[in-house]
Swiss-Prot record:
Lineage start: Bacteria, Pseudomonadati, Pseudomonadota, Alphaproteobacteria, Hyphomicrobiales
Composition-biased stretches (Basic and acidic residues): 8-29
UniProt cofactor(s): [4Fe-4S] cluster
HAMAP family xrefs: Lipoyl_synth
Domain called Radical SAM core: residue spans: 73-289
Assigned keywords, A-Z: 4Fe-4S, Cytoplasm, Iron, Iron-sulfur, Metal-binding, S-adenosyl-L-methionine, Transferase
Source organism of this protein record: Rhodopseudomonas palustris (strain BisA53)
Pathway: Protein modification; protein lipoylation via endogenous pathway; protein N(6)-(lipoyl)lysine from octanoyl-[acyl-carrier-protein]: step 2/2
EC number: 2.8.1.8
Main location: cytoplasm
Protein name (Swiss-Prot/TrEMBL): Lipoyl synthase
Sequence positions that bind [4Fe-4S] cluster 1: C61, C66, C72, S300
SMART domains for the chain: Elp3
Region (Disordered): 1-29
PANTHER family the record matches: LIPOYL SYNTHASE (PTHR10949), LIPOYL SYNTHASE, MITOCHONDRIAL (PTHR10949:SF0)
Amino acid sequence: MVVVVDTVSDKPIRPRHPEKAARPDALSPKKPDWIRVRAPTSRGYADTRAIVKENGLHTVCEEAGCPNIGECWDRKHATFMIMGDTCTRACAFCNVKTGMPAALDGAEPANVAEATAKLGLAHLVITSVDRDDLADGGAAHIAATIRAVRERCPSTTIEVLTPDFLRKDGALEIVVAAKPDVFNHNLETVPARYLEVRPGARYFHSIRLLQRAKEIDPTLFTKSGIMLGLGEQRSEVLQVMDDLRSADVDFLTIGQYLQPTLKHHAVMSYIPPEEFSSYESLAYAKGFLMVSSSPMTRSSHHAGADFAKLQAARAALPR
């Protein structure tokens, strides 16, 4: 018999996803050859990680287990996840910790601004956990972070990827009033899969959130994304595109769902690259100004370069 003694900490380790612990393992098919990423070992990666840690910040790159972290951090592109590392929702696809979050860190907006300056980011993406425990869903904290970055890095463009602010009246208005350049809220999947994949959310509430953001500020770029491989049908994906266009959404991202752990939703299918290309063509035909559709596409992947293309596409529209 072998006895393993933990000499590092005497504190019990809390499960990352306690609500999923009793679930049976969900087995996914083997990853195909086109799902490949390189290990994060570069100097740029190490430098980015050091800046994130010295400012006491969290990133969705780490917390959600993004497969593109090696590529992005090598270029010193990081997406900050504010309001803590613990989410009040328990989506079946997400690797972010779940539970009761800690109190907000009042120094976080300034720390995000400082890290943005140190990384030299021309385009910053800020996302967050859901904070259903807060009266405004964290909207004022998001707005404060936007303002802090504007003051510290006035030339940096800002993209926010927000929660849905369900039952948080006035929260959206607070965020939009802070004047981000891009307002992003991901639908994640088709409406028929919400009960199983995103049970705490409401599909048409999310559609309306995106529509309302553009109504409040017509100069705002709006953006949303979905994952494929969760059991959706092609016709349902096309309907999501139509729903987003009816809400005047400018930018659509489509990527392959990858299972974080065996306790998360299984991958039902791996979508081949040519089908992603087909969806991209159809989305452009439906009127999106910008579309990014590939197996490895994620909301903030190449966000800066894509924002420049988005600006150019709007500028080219007939007056």
